[in-house]
Amino acid sequence: MSQQKGNKSRINVEIYGQQYSVVGDESTSHIRMVAAIVDDKMRELNAKNPSLDTSRLAVLTAVNVIHDYIKLKEEHEKLKESMTQKGME
């Protein structure tokens, strides 16, 4: 189910077997994609750590996703700097 209110989208998604109502500025397809990635990451980590309860699994998922985000952000900054340097030559 999805609704639009102003520029906000409200959509129900399932993450790791739980239903969540998510509200965001992005399209419903974007919100679904984000939810699917979170679900995939949680299932991937659960396969490696089956003894973790859901709360710990969620925190570990958040830590891993933020780690990936920071690495990508650093790589992006290096690429921008490299392009700036090449533009100055």
From Swiss-Prot:
Q: Where is the signal peptide?
A: none
- GO annotation terms (biological process): division septum assembly; FtsZ-dependent cytokinesis; septin ring assembly
Q: Alphabetically list the UniProt keywords.
A: Cell cycle, Cell division, Cytoplasm, Septation
Where, per UniProt, does this protein localize? Cytoplasm
The yes or no answer to whether the keyword Cell division is present is yes
* UniProt main location, coarse: cytoplasm
Q: Which InterPro entries match?
A: Bac_CellDiv_Activator (IPR053712), Cell_div_ZapA-like (IPR007838), Cell_div_ZapA-like_sf (IPR036192), Cell_div_ZapA_firmicutes (IPR023688)
CC annotations in GO: cell division site; cell septum; cytosol; plasma membrane
Report the superkingdom from the record.
Bacteria
**Role noted for this protein:** Activator of cell division through the inhibition of FtsZ GTPase activity, therefore promoting FtsZ assembly into bundles of protofilaments necessary for the formation of the division Z ring. It is recruited early at mid-cell but it is not essential for cell division.
What family does this chain come from, according to its entry? Belongs to the ZapA family. Type 2 subfamily.
Q: How does it assemble?
A: Homodimer. Interacts with FtsZ.
What this protein is called in its record is: Cell division protein ZapA
